[in-house]
């Protein structure tokens, strides 16, 4: 994965995620819009088969980079929890 910050202000962030698909971007967007600091979050893929997705985040004044880091930490935590639960079930 390559990540390119296209634009950043105090409350907005525009990030291109090269080589990624709807799978990761939908997950990020869904968790971002649940965060109370986020005013809006969405992504765009101009040409689905040839474009890299661009994630847009607008916050209520919170640093959008910190908000995105927090959301990624939630994803990592949920994946770790899944690994634990799955491992226990697989060994039962």
UniProtKB/Swiss-Prot annotation:
UniProt-listed Enzyme Commission number(s): 2.7.7.6
Subcellular locations according to the entry: Cytoplasm
Database matches in InterPro entries: RBP11-like, RBP11-like_dimer, RNA_pol_Rpb11_13-16kDa_CS, Rpo11-like
Main location: cytoplasm
SUPFAM superfamilies recorded: RBP11-like subunits of RNA polymerase (SSF55257)
Enzyme kind, highest EC tier: transferase
Superkingdom classification of source: Archaea
Catalytic activity: RNA(n) + a ribonucleoside 5'-triphosphate = RNA(n+1) + diphosphate
Gene Ontology MF terms in the entry: DNA binding; DNA-directed RNA polymerase activity; protein dimerization activity
GO cellular component, one term: cytoplasm
Keyword tags: Cytoplasm, DNA-directed RNA polymerase, Nucleotidyltransferase, Transcription, Transferase
Any single Pfam family the record assigns to this protein: RNA_pol_L_2
CDD domains: RNAP_L
Example GO BP: DNA-templated transcription
PROSITE patterns: RNA_POL_L_13KD (PS01154)
Subunit text: Part of the RNA polymerase complex.
Main function: DNA-dependent RNA polymerase (RNAP) catalyzes the transcription of DNA into RNA using the four ribonucleoside triphosphates as substrates.
Similarity remark: Belongs to the archaeal Rpo11/eukaryotic RPB11/RPC19 RNA polymerase subunit family.
Name listed for the protein in its UniProt record: DNA-directed RNA polymerase subunit Rpo11
Name of encoding gene: rpo11
